[in-house]
A protein has these predicted regions:
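Conserved, well-structured interaction surfaces
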Residues: 74-150, 182-185, 197-207, 372-379, ...
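Extended ligand-binding clefts on enzyme/binding-domain cores
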Residues: 176, 182-186, 241-252, 256-372, ...
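Short, surface-exposed recognition loops and adjoining beta-strand edges that mediate ligand/DNA contacts
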Residues: 51-68, 122, 151-162, 166, ...
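Inward-facing hydrophobic residues that define packing positions of alpha-helical scaffold repeats
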Residues: 37, 102-105, 144, 188, ...
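Membrane-proximal, proline-rich intrinsically disordered regions
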Residues: 11-61, 251, 298, 305-319, ...
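Structural register within alpha-helical repeat arrays
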Residues: 132, 139, 146, 223, ...
């Protein structure tokens, strides 16, 4: 498919190089649409996004990982030490990567009518309708991530403040730097509008587990996430909060589809060769599980970033990790919590020290061919566990401790051997919700934005074999500190 950059102006786009496809000719048939939408899916493989920077750097900037004393070579140091600005290459790459997806979606919308006018058969019309829904979802997801990472949390006070939202580029010819920033409410409303269109166009038959394609389950999961972020910003319990009620409703739709089940981390269910695996282990090693709502499909010859490369630093001889697992986070796991051994192992590094290695992304053997492992795993941007966590938190802010406890208990029973039920209430319940998000969503890119929306400090506690200092393993950035502004990445 032709690659069309979003940064060019409308005048520049009129200059067509010899031998290239004129812009208006790129989308003429259903087959053209199929190819274009596959290109949008492919854009999500970008190693600046879910398979790289966007997933790892928010957690590294927070408190999930510690720079290794002897094996860190300066990788991601700007983020770890909070020395970032809008021109920091990784930030620019995330921003541009998300807007590239928006741009590809907008190009489709600009020219979809000329395709629709040619449709004759029911099959072609159904296929086109499905593609329209997929593109609306892709744009909604990209916009939502831009809001989460590059904007302040929405509150009653700032919802309609000018220039606090994102640039809502709505046509391909829009030059993003020239588009005025919207309000936060306008930004979120555009996401919800796109999700409504996605819901109306994506077929129900797409709602299956372990899916590399967008589905109604993914639509509802994103709605639940977005409504939670819209509704909890005031950090006050309000039983009549409509955003939070809609978050609960959307999460319930995901669960009620019956298509997805929480992965079992307790009982062995699979055997590969001579090795027994739980469903949870299979999800993180082989990228397969009925808990997965949407994963980014990869092959040995078509993949994005390598999530485990710098975390493991393994060269078939020794481990030289750039970062170690945070001992403070590790202490949050119960002794019977089976996630801990999936995400972390104490191993000997290249210097003979016993260090906590981050093993969440060990590399899928079906993707990691060759003598030297690449540590490729398929990102899983939507899982059922996050849906339960979002609903539990929405229930908490609605003042419904009982249902929040039920959702947390449902998740924890699948993760912890012999777990009974959550009994915490009030502030203790909120603390447990926060801790459970840290345990379950470790190194998936949620931590910094979670701390930001809760106004919680970003605090690291000194640990062995990590680089010392107030900007390293003793970092403590409070909500009232000027430095806290960097929990929102600068544009």
């Amino acid at each position: 498919m032709p690659i069309l950059a979003f940064t060019v102006s409308s005048c520049e786009m009129n200059l067509v190089p010899d031998g290239s496809i004129p812009e208006k000719e790129a989308l003429r048939t259903v087959k053209d649409c199929d190819a274009w939408v596959l290109g949008i899916y492919s854009a999500f493989k970008n190693d600046a996004l879910y398979s790289g920077s966007m997933a790892l750097l928010q957690d590294i900037q927070a408190d999930m990982a510690y720079a290794a004393l002897k094996t860190n070579s300066g990788i991601y140091t700007q983020f770890y030490q909070w020395n970032i600005k809008s021109t920091t290459s990784e930030i620019a790459n995330v921003y541009n990567g998300l807007y590239m997806i928006v741009s590809r979606c907008n190009f489709f919308f600009d020219y979809k009518d000329q395709v629709e006018a040619t449709l004759k058969t029911t099959a072609d019309k159904d296929d086109f309708k499905k593609r329209v829904g997929e593109v609306y979802f892709a744009r909604a997801l990209a916009f939502s991530e831009l809001i989460r990472i590059f904007c302040e949390p929405m509150t009653t006070a700032n919802a309609n403040t000018e220039n606090m939202g994102i640039c809502l580029a709505m046509t391909y010819s829009d030059d993003v730097p020239m588009v005025k920033r919207s309000t936060l409410l306008e930004s979120y409303n555009q996401v919800l509008s796109d999700l409504k269109q996605a819901e109306e166009n994506i077929p129900a038959a797409r709602t299956v587990a372990d899916n590399p394609y967008f589905s109604l389950g993914a639509v509802y999961a994103l709605q639940a996430r977005v409504y939670l972020n819209m509704g909890m910003g005031d950090l006050s319990i309000k039983k009549d909060n409509e955003y939070l009620k809609k978050s609960v409703e959307a999460a319930g739709k995901v669960i009620k589809t019956g298509a997805y089940t929480l992965s079992d981390a307790v009982n062995n269910a699979f055997q590969v060769g001579s090795t027994q695996y739980t469903d949870y282990q299979m999800m993180w090693k082989y990228d397969q599980s009925d808990e997965i709502i949407w994963k980014i499909a990869m092959t040995p010859v078509s993949y994005g970033g390598t999530l485990g490369r710098y975390l493991l630093g393994y060269n078939t001889v020794a481990y030289s990790p750039q970062y170690h697992f945070s001992e403070a986070i590790l202490s949050l796991y119960d002794d019977n919590d089976r996630r801990a051994s999936v995400f972390c192992n104490q191993l000997e590094d290249a210097y003979g020290d016993q260090v906590y290695i981050i093993t969440k992304y060990p590399g899928n053997p079906d993707l990691d061919g060759g003598a030297t492992p690449k540590f490729i795993n398929m990102p899983k941007p939507f899982r059922l566990s996050e849906v339960y966590l979002n609903r539990a938190e929405a229930y908490y802010w609605l003042g419904d401790d009982e249902n929040a406890q039920k959702d947390l208990s449902s998740l924890k029973r699948k993760r912890i051997t012999g777990f009974g039920s959550v009994s915490a209430s009030g502030d203790d319940l909120l603390k447990e919700i926060k801790n459970e998000r840290a345990r379950e969503l470790y190194m998936e890119g949620f931590r910094l934005s979670d701390l930001k929306r809760w106004h919680d400090p970003v605090k690291r506690e000194k640990q062995l074999y990590s680089i010392d200092g107030s900007i390293n393993n003793e970092l403590n950035v409070k909500y009232t500190d000027a430095k806290y502004r960097f929990t929102t990445w600068p544009i």
